[in-house]
């Protein structure tokens, strides 16, 4: 959700975005990432044992494990489904780093998204799924190196 928000910011106020980092969302920003209604329902279910949707169970378990605000996450899911067009993505001129886990079946291709942008690079977060990719040490190291290479002046 943060990657979608960051991309929207870069499109709406490009003059305010010196560098852009999109973690956990690739081409899915353009072609969608599936049906999120069962995930929102899983996050707001009173009893996690009643959740039957496999992806919903995964998101619910992760939210509970990290003690996240499940209602806030569900609200974000319900309001952040707007897709961004290829033309819009191509208009993002800020240096951009895109990170997607190699086991992420939600995000879509980081490489494919980066190829649309004039100054973007993709980073494969090896062995990580959607839930674990942005917390990965290799991703964090890549982000720090990217920011060092693209200092905000």
Q: What does each of the following model-derived ranges do?
A:
Residues 104-110:
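Conserved alpha/beta-hydrolase "acid-adjacent" motif
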Residues 123-153:
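Catalytic active-site module of serine/aspartate enzymes centered on a nucleophile-bearing elbow/loop
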Residues 4-47:
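Flexible "cap/lid" loop of the alpha/beta hydrolase fold
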Residues 92, 98-100:
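Short beta-strand/loop motif that positions the catalytic acidic residue
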Residues 89-93, 115-117:
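Short, conserved loop/helix-junction motifs that constitute active-site signature segments
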Residues 101-104, 127-129:
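Acidic beta-to-alpha connecting loop that harbors the catalytic carboxylate
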Residues 60-85:
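Hydrophobic, aromatic-rich cap/lid helix
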